[in-house]
């Protein structure tokens, strides 16, 4: 039974790789691109429609037979919460952005603080998470040295020498990625300009 589930997951990944390119797809196009049967493609699309991962767009132009249905990724299926911590001359800045699957900002909130404490950060984070968005992943960019959630050197003194990942995991359920701000910029540059 495990091999059947593994094969199903592999097939779902093939379909997702196509749909996550942001284009509109027909069932026939997906079946051709992935080399999956029309029946398998239909079953996967039905499951994705039911879970609201994709949405029906329209019927495509007919070539003489029945019109094919067109599908695309549902942009609000999942969201990413991007958090940037930044120290200014006299204050600490917390920048929160909720981003949909088409890389559009659906919510943005900037906070400023004189102390920049972990407690302030958690309070702000919980407030943003209450917005009811489908946040699946939180990506935290901070000005400091980070190793598996442990912050060594950091412009936010109160966060320094603390395992911020463990602190966050106790408070929130979403997957958390923490990275140095320069590394985040490099990753972003790669995906925007080279990918």
Summary of predicted features, one role per range:
Residues 1-27, 31:
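Extreme N-terminal segment that seeds HTH/winged-HTH DNA-binding domains in transcriptional regulators
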Residues 4-9, 23-25, 40-43, 47, ...:
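Short glycine/proline-centered loop/turn elements that form peptide/ligand docking sites
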Residues 19, 30, 41-54:
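Basic amphipathic alpha-helical segments that dock to polyanions
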Residues 56-80, 178-195:
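Conserved phosphate-binding catalytic cores of ATP/NTP-utilizing and phosphoryl-transfer enzymes
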Residues 65-106:
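Gly/Thr-rich phosphate-binding beta-strand-loop-beta motif of the actin/hexokinase/Hsp70
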Residues 105-110, 114-126, 134-194:
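Glycine-rich phosphate-binding loop and adjoining helix at the ATP-binding site
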């Amino acid at each position: 039974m495990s091999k059947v589930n593994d094969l199903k997951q592999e097939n779902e990944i093939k379909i997702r790789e196509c749909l996550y390119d942001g284009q509109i797809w027909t069932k026939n196009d997906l079946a051709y691109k992935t080399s999956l049967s029309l029946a398998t493609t239909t079953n996967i699309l039905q499951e994705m429609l039911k879970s609201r991962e994709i949405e029906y767009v329209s019927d495509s132009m007919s070539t003489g037979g029945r019109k094919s249905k067109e599908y695309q990724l549902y942009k609000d299926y999942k969201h990413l919460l991007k958090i940037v911590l930044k120290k200014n001359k006299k204050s600490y800045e917390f920048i929160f952005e909720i981003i949909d699957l088409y890389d559009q900002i659906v919510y943005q909130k900037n906070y400023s603080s004189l102390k920049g404490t972990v407690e302030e950060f958690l309070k702000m984070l919980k407030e943003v998470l209450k917005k009811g968005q489908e946040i699946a992943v939180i990506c935290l960019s901070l000005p400091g040295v980070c190793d598996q959630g442990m912050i060594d050197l950091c412009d936010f003194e109160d966060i320094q020498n603390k395992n911020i990942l463990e602190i966050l995991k106790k408070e929130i359920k979403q997957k958390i990625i923490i990275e140095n701000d320069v590394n985040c910029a490099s990753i972003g540059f790669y995906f925007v300009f080279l990918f």
